[in-house]
């Protein structure tokens, strides 16, 4: 059958919902959360919890509202033993995001009475943000062969997470960098993971199942896995002096993909990448081995922009974020960087789920254009040739 009808491959430029959460101008490189530019948010020294609140409630919190909100998030730090067991029964070599999926799926299995409710949805989401911190801490500690640990309340979400993950008091520089990373990865409209989660909750499945679906999509190398792929690329080059040769051999002549470059929406420099680059430069300057990776990245960036900038292909947020995670102290293994992405994005996922279910609820059920054989007659197996 000929392909006579148009389809939207990859759902590109298909609008599936209205949103007050995030707006992107891909041509100008602008990203705003609820009307606030990410540059202003970061420059103002905002805490991640303020941005979490913005996504769930639509406004920045007062001091009193923020204190109350933090208490709700911190309730989620105490995850049940069966969730920790779901993580620790897996091989330590397992993918970190798959471990998160197992833990969140365990939450979904236990929440048999979940009902979408405007009066409680945001409290459920806030507590789940806390649970995601505890889950990610224990995923990391299991991979690193460390005993189970739960985050404890502190001055910030970022600090509680790092203290529990590393088993020591995080430095101010580490906390500030993690806080910024959490904010920058909070949301990005409806990429593959958010869309996957929306499909799940459009059936009125529970919040946790929506997160599990989103994690499954995020796990792929074309979405959340790009940060680790970019670092692996820098490691392959090994030395700044080898960048030009590697670029010509692998990208220009080898036709390989330059990881961390290009974005479906942005046709200019990703504003998040600019911020991550600045943090990577600052943090790596105190760690020679990491700074060498940063030097490789910046030199490769120059070649990439010269070759592809005229086509609207520039560094995206994943190009430098891995260097930031590495500088904080997270190793390149088990897809850990993508799990850190998920720790940030759980806020945006849930905000989109709530917005959709409360205001625009409709089962997402697209169609496919059939291009297979026309009508055929069934032939019994003994008569087939």
Swiss-Prot record:
GO terms for cellular component: cytoplasm. Its EC number is 2.3.3.16. Pathway: Carbohydrate metabolism; tricarboxylic acid cycle; isocitrate from oxaloacetate: step 1/2. The active site is at residues 223, 263, 318. InterPro entries: 2-MeCitrate/Citrate_synth_II (IPR011278), Cit_synThplmales (IPR054926), Citrate_synth-like_lrg_a-sub (IPR016142), Citrate_synth-like_sm_a-sub (IPR016143), Citrate_synthase (IPR002020), Citrate_synthase_AS (IPR019810), Citrate_synthase_bac-typ (IPR024176), Citrate_synthase_sf (IPR036969). It comes from the Archaea. Allosterically inhibited by NADH. GO terms for molecular function: citrate (Si)-synthase activity. It catalyses: oxaloacetate + acetyl-CoA + H2O = citrate + CoA + H(+). Pfam families: Citrate_synt. One of its GO terms (biological process) is tricarboxylic acid cycle. It is an enzyme of class 2 (transferase). Belongs to the citrate synthase family. Homodimer. This is Citrate synthase. It comes from Thermoplasma acidophilum (strain ATCC 25905 / DSM 1728 / JCM 9062 / NBRC 15155 / AMRC-C165).
């Amino acid at each position: 059958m000929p392909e006579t009808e148009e389809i939207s491959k990859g759902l590109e430029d298909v609008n599936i919902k209205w949103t007050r959460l995030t707006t992107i101008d891909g041509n100008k490189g602008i990203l705003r959360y609820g009307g606030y530019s990410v540059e202003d948010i970061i420059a103002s020294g905002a805490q991640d919890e303020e941005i979490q609140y913005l996504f769930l409630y639509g406004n920045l919190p007062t001091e009193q509202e923020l204190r109350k909100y933090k208490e709700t998030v911190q309730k989620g730090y105490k995850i049940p033993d069966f969730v920790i067991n779901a993580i620790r029964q897996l091989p330590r070599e397992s993918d970190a995001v798959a471990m998160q999926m197992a833990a969140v799926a365990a939450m979904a299995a236990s929440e048999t009475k979940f009902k979408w409710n405007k009066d409680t949805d945001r409290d459920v989401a806030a507590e789940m943000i806390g649970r995601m911190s505890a889950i990610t801490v224990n995923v990391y500690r299991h991979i690193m062969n460390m005993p189970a640990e739960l985050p404890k309340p502190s001055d910030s979400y970022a600090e509680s997470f790092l203290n529990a993950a590393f088993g020591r008091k995080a430095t101010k520089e580490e906390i500030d960098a993690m806080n910024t990373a959490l904010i920058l990865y909070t949301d990005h409209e409806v990429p593959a993971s958010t869309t996957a989660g929306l499909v799940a909750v459009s059936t009125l499945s529970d919040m946790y199942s929506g997160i599990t679906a989103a994690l499954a999509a995020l796990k792929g190398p074309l979405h959340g896995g790009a940060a680790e792929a970019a670092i692996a690329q820098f490691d392959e080059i090994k030395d700044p002096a080898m960048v030009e040769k590697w670029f010509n051999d692998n990208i220009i002549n080898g036709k390989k993909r330059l990881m961390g470059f290009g974005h479906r929406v942005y046709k200019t420099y990703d504003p998040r990448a600019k911020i991550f680059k600045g943090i990577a430069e600052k943090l790596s300057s105190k760690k020679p081995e990491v700074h060498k990776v940063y030097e490789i990245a910046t030199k490769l960036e120059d070649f990439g922009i010269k070759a592809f900038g005229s086509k609207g292909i520039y560094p995206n947020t994943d190009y430098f974020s891995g260097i930031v995670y590495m500088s904080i102290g997270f190793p390149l293994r088990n897809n850990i960087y993508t799990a850190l992405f998920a720790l940030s994005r759980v806020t945006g996922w849930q905000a989109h789920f709530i917005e959709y279910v409360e205001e625009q609820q409709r089962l997402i059920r697209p169609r496919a254009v059939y291009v297979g054989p026309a009508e055929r007659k069934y032939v019994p197996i003994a008569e087939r040739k």
